[in-house]
Amino acid sequence: MMVLKGWDGYSLRLTLYPSFSLSMFKLDEDVYLKYLGLCKGLRIYDYGYDVVVLGGYCDIDYVRELCGVLEDPLNYVYEVELRFNDVYYYLVTQWRGVGLSTATRDFDHVFISIFLSKRTSYHDRVLQWVDSLFNIIDNPVDLINIDTSNLFKPPQIRELSGVFKEYFYNVRPYVVRGNINDVRYNLLRIKGVGPKITYAYLLHAMRFTEIAPIDTHFNYFIFNVLGLKYGMPKKELCLKYDCSKCNSNCVMKELRSFFGKSLGYLQTVVYIHVKMLCKKGRCYECVLRKYRLCKLKS
């Protein structure tokens, strides 16, 4: 047994909830069991503001990464442009429980769960689909030798084996080398993989926090709470240009400029904030409302 230190307010449950790492865990009462990928059999649970770790040997740094305690998100407030500094600070302060859980040593599993999350609910469907899939296969590599289009009805799973083969041969070698630009470019070349999937992968499988997927929650936050009026990333432009060299009116370019390495942390906290407060009309609990930092009209 070992205990990993968190920070005041840290919560394993809140940290895993928005993460694609969650797809490799099963929750049994208050204990998370890692049943897929590296460190299978690992058991972790909240212990105050720390995490108790039980089970077989696993590199402590990777366990800390999975638990989201590598870095306190508040440490990245210095990355944020002055005009949004208070937004980041107060948002992270309100959700002190949320860390950034990534899985850089389980990148194949992360790709699967991210691709399956396309146009559907992660918690309501994808977690079940992943479980069903790994009742049939033992490892992600097995997808190279099977045709999922004959095994499942949901279109995401039907497409998975074909997409995974392209990923395995054309993207994975660059992942192993840690080459962000080549991973980004070759992911975008895959049919059915757009900027959202690509940027989610860079964040959750490679821990590249200077970029983040613009999911429905983040999109709501950007346009309604921050009041930013820019266009969404377009695959054809992302294939041609790096953000720094793109002249389009794209929100991703601006977000990277405004938030730097804090962007991935921001998107993770925003997922919880929008889902728990904004979408439920609980503005009276929002710290951004309290300090008049939200652009959304009452």
What function would you assign to each model-found segment?
Residues 1-104, 223, 229, 253, ...:
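Intrinsically disordered, low-complexity, charged terminal extensions of DNA damage-control enzymes
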